[in-house]
Swiss-Prot record:
Organism: Flavobacterium psychrophilum (strain ATCC 49511 / DSM 21280 / CIP 103535 / JIP02/86)
EC number: 3.5.2.7
Recorded coiled-coil stretches: none
Any one biological process term the GO annotation gives: L-histidine catabolic process to glutamate and formamide
Cofactor(s) for this UniProt protein: Zn(2+); Fe(3+)
Function: Catalyzes the hydrolytic cleavage of the carbon-nitrogen bond in imidazolone-5-propanoate to yield N-formimidoyl-L-glutamate. It is the third step in the universal histidine degradation pathway.
GO molecular function: imidazolonepropionase activity; iron ion binding; zinc ion binding
Binding site for 4-imidazolone-5-propanoate: R87, Y150, H183, Q251, T327
Pfam families registered for this protein in UniProt: Amidohydro_1 (PF01979)
Annotated pathway: Amino-acid degradation; L-histidine degradation into L-glutamate; N-formimidoyl-L-glutamate from L-histidine: step 3/3
Name of this protein: Imidazolonepropionase
Cofactor note (record): Binds 1 zinc or iron ion per subunit.
Keywords: Cytoplasm, Histidine metabolism, Hydrolase, Iron, Metal-binding, Zinc
Compartments, as annotated in UniProt: Cytoplasm
């Protein structure tokens, strides 16, 4: 099937050659073509350019995008959208003054989600999760990483990962699965960390590998959760099964986690609300992508990732939602992009780069997603008529998306 989109006001994120990511000052450059066309053949980008060079060919569908912006779909590299129930009461508790840590110490937080999940059938979890997945697709997300981590038992973690696998099989959106058994210590292991880590290493990982349920491995490396040493043991065990690390780190404290993650060649380090000068030096020249989660900072009123400091140091940066029931019950990447501009002082160019090509890198798919490049997946957003692409951040609560293509088809 051939689809030709013509008269595009601004075609964004055009890259003639494949690139993995953009860093530092390059993040402020967003290549675009004004008055452009885009040709989709089957599920791939076949051609693009200025309307003056638009080919005269027979197509199955022609779309006039006069006045509209076209760009790649968002690549959301950090989510927890497979879960059961909600944590609305904790939302009210925070309003009344309780901290994240205080809620967790009272049996809330991750352990609350684990309790809900383990009491819910796999079918019910799938049915709840697919609604969230369909919603984020309509909001322009064309690739998503989904974590386990609300099982915290062998059966619970396997159940979550099977749901993720089923979602990937039933929907056109690109899905990457991450095993996050080390999300928190279950209450019965609170005083016996070694036994829970052994459960992850000796029972969870072999079963996950046998069913090929995960691409990545994650750990919540944070004070009160998993230490650097505990994290390293889990990372090393995961690597034996081919699982690449993508790590939660520096959300509340800096305890040397980033240095460890870089040493172990983590694909990404995520959260980074607290970043030291030493952390920045450790990230320089590495293959590890820093990932900011601004809607989490917004929702639970914690600091924002210091994007300006990191970009000025020459680092790359990706943006993701952290969609989860406790601290970010939203998967709207449009809000993430706008919040990055408003609260983190990223330019629209930087934010769009962070949410497309760098987001693709942070989930290992930048060779097929994240830019308008010949041969890449035809995952694109067509906006409503706009004055400029800056409006995508400026009109931060408006739905500016008219159509979303995933794998060459309007969803």
């Amino acid at each position: 099937m051939k689809t030709l989109i013509i008269n595009i006001k601004e075609l964004l994120q055009v890259r003639d050659n494949h690139i993995d990511k953009v860093s530092g000052t390059e993040m402020g450059v967003l290549p675009k073509i004004d008055d452009a066309f885009l040709l989709i053949e089957d599920n791939l980008i076949a051609n693009f350019g200025s309307m003056s060079n638009c080919p005269t060919i027979k197509t199955d569908q022609t779309i006039d995008a006069k006045g509209k912006i076209v760009l790649p779909t968002w690549c959301d590299s950090h989510t927890h959208i497979v879960y059961a129930g909600n944590r609305i009461q904790e939302f009210v508790d925070r309003i009344k003054g309780l901290s994240y840590e205080e809620i967790a110490n009272r049996g809330g937080g991750i352990l609350n989600s684990a309790k809900n999940l383990n009491q819910t059938s796999e079918e019910d979890i799938y049915n709840q999760s697919k609604v969230r997945l369909e919603e984020i697709m309509q909001q322009g997300t064309g690739a998503v990483e989904i974590k386990s981590g609300y099982g915290l038992t062998v059966d619970g973690e396997i159940k979550m990962l099977r749901v993720i696998k089923k979602l990937a099989a039933n929907y056109p959106i690109k899905i990457k699965a991450t095993f996050l058994g080390a999300h928190a210590f279950p209450s019965e292991y609170k005083e016996n960390h070694a036994d829970y880590i052994n459960l992850i290493v000796n029972e969870m990982l072999p079963k996950i590998a046998a069913e090929k349920l995960a691409d990545y491995i994650d750990v919540f490396l944070e004070t009160g959760y998993f230490s650097v040493q505990e994290t390293e043991k889990i990372i090393e065990a995961g690597k034996k099964y081919g699982l690449i690390p993508k790590i939660h780190v520096n959300q509340f404290t800096a305890i040397g986690g980033i240095k460890s993650c870089v040493k172990h060649e983590a694909l990404s380090v995520d959260h980074l609300e607290i970043v030291t000068n030493e952390d920045i030096e450790n990230l320089k020249g590495s293959k590890t992508m820093p990932v900011a989660l601004p809607s989490c900072s917004y929702f639970i009123s914690i600091p924002y990732t210091p994007a300006r400091k990191m970009i000025a140091a020459g680092l790359p940066l990706a943006l993701a939602t952290d969609y989860n029931p406790g601290t970010t019950p939203s998967g709207n990447m449009n809000f993430v992009v706008a919040t990055a501009c408003i609260k983190m002082k990223m330019t629209p160019e930087e934010a769009i780069n962070a949410a497309t090509i760098n987001g693709a890198y942070a989930m290992g798919i930048s060779q097929t997603h994240g830019s308008i490049t010949k041969g890449k997946s035809a995952n694109i957003i067509i906006t409503k008529p706009l004055t400029t692409y800056y409006e995508m951040a400026y009109s931060f609560t408006s739905n500016l998306i008219e159509n979303v293509f995933i794998e060459g088809k309007i969803i």
